[in-house]
Design a protein with these regions (language model features):
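Membrane-proximal periplasmic segments of bacterial cell-envelope enzymes
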Residues: 1-213
């Protein structure tokens, strides 16, 4: 039987680094600063059972969350659900169309009109329950804040599920301590890595950021 070599081309976009900008007196008005991000690539074999994959991912993300927070940093917080002052789940969007667009995305629907009435009327808490079931997260064993952080990270990873080689940012602009701790524990953090980013800084504030570049 002939041997075949499987060749896979993986394409990633690498942002360019902009140079420093000086004013006419030689003072720096825009510069780059090295920053670290915690990223993850889904390297779990595609034939892994869903239950097993969920456990691997959840254990990994739980460890990442602990490391990040122990060093004073935070994981991503760009999900469509937030916690209100009483600790209850609420939709981040108050605009009804935007809220329904988010609900449609959660349910994998291309159009809002594809949602059933039951799906349209789901509360934020029901959406979280729905995703916990999908991700194999035990809703009853953890507080709302922990669950929301885990759902945040799992949902972000899910957005790249059809392009597994794309990395997902779990925490951005983290401290040197966080970056070092992640690297020290990398053997037990499947697919997790530290990426170097270039953040644009403006000594005189953001007032002219859109003009300076």
């Amino acid at each position: 039987m002939e041997n075949y070599e499987l060749q896979i081309r993986k394409t990633r976009t690498v942002p360019g680094t902009r140079g420093n900008i000086f004013d006419r007196n030689g003072e720096v008005i825009a510069y780059n600063e090295l920053a670290y991000s915690v990223t993850i690539e889904d390297i779990i074999p595609t034939d892994t059972k869903t239950e097993d994959k969920n456990k691997i991912l959840n254990d990994t993300l739980d460890s990442v969350l602990s490391i990040v927070e122990e060093n004073g940093d935070s994981v991503i917080d760009n999900f469509g659900i937030i916690l209100d002052s009483s600790g209850s789940y609420q939709f981040a969007e108050t605009n009804e169309t935007s809220r329904l667009r988010f609900v449609a995305d959660v349910h994998g629907k291309s159009f809002i009109d594809d949602l059933t009435e039951k799906e349209k009327n789901k509360t934020a808490e029901q959406i979280v329950h729905y995703l916990c079931k999908r991700y194999g997260l035990d809703y009853s064993e953890h507080d709302a804040a922990y669950i929301l952080k885990m759902v945040n990270m799992r949902y972000a990873m899910g957005l790249n599920s059809y392009q597994q080689w794309l990395t997902t940012v779990l925490a951005s602009d983290v401290s040197d301590a966080t970056a070092a701790a992640i690297m020290e524990n990398q053997d037990s953090l499947q697919g997790v890595d530290i990426s170097e980013d270039s953040l644009r800084r403006y000594p005189d504030g953001q007032y002219f950021a859109s003009i300076i570049g």
